[in-house]
Design a protein with these regions (language model features):
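A domain-level signal for the structural core that forms small-molecule/cofactor-binding pockets
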Residues: 2-244
Length: 244
């Protein structure tokens, strides 16, 4: 449904308030011509109190899924509150990166004019594949080549940004690219390198059920693309940190 059609249907806040939270949020997204794919952050279009409403809505829909799976949640004490647990898990934890703003990150000027390679990692990350909503669990290494105009952020902030980006359904290739965009915009380094290695439970748990395979991908920008020696140094130090 187009933005114009929606605006024609819903003319007042009072009318909107009678809709489920998901429909109100979707209305705002479409009205602002914003995409809302599985790995998009939509927090700017969520108002106070709506996440609680959204959890209740998801729980209700999840109860319907359990019913369709012919699970007797009334007499089975193990599944009495499964729908509510799953809703809370999705909204507050594993898909949290969709629904909350990016964590606050304090940036500091590079007064010391640092221009040597910095590596952060391995950072443990958890995500979910958007195809089957199965877990993705892995590690991320970040290489930064700052310049005198770069911003510096605390080590823990790299982990917080990683968690925010990863906490949503997506494919690994897009997740690493999204993380690179956030760090490039924040730190503004001469070079940025990111490597992610992860287990995909959509492959371990179902389908071919191969529990040995991992997926590794990388993003190299700026100095890491231009300078093969810098790239080798990063990968060698990363491998050394992996063994320790």
């Amino acid at each position: 449904m187009s933005s114009a059609t929606l605006k024609g249907l819903f003319r007042s806040e009072e009318e909107l308030s009678r809709l489920p939270a998901s429909e109100r949020i979707r209305y705002r997204l479409i009205g602002a011509d914003c995409r809302y794919h599985a790995n998009d952050n939509i927090s700017a279009h969520i108002r106070d109190g709506e996440l609680e409403e959204l959890k209740a809505e998801v729980a209700q829909q999840m109860q319907g899924v359990l019913k369709s799976l012919v699970i007797d949640t009334e007499s089975d004490h193990n599944t009495n509150e499964t729908a509510q647990r799953v809703a809370k898990m999705f909204v507050e934890e594993v898909f949290r990166g969709r629904y909350v703003p990016m964590p606050s990150v304090t940036e500091f000027p590079n007064f010391s004019r640092l221009n040597e390679l910095m590596i952060v990692g391995p950072i443990k990350v958890r995500s979910a594949c958007s195809h089957h909503l199965c877990p993705i669990i892995g590690r991320v290494w970040i290489g930064i080549m700052p310049n005198e105009f770069s911003n510096l952020i605390g080590l823990s902030k790299y982990a917080r940004i990683c968690d925010w980006v990863m906490s949503r359904p997506q494919i690994q290739e897009e997740a690493v690219t999204m993380l690179a965009e956030e760090l490039q915009n924040r730190v503004k380094p001469d070079g940025l390198a990111i490597v992610m290695e992860a287990d995909h439970f959509c492959m371990h748990w179902r389908g071919v059920k191969d529990d040995e395979s991992v997926m590794t991908n990388s993003v190299m920008r700026g100095a890491f693309l231009r300078d093969a020696n810098l790239r080798r140094e990063f990968l060698a130090l990363m491998a050394n940190k992996s063994r320790n």
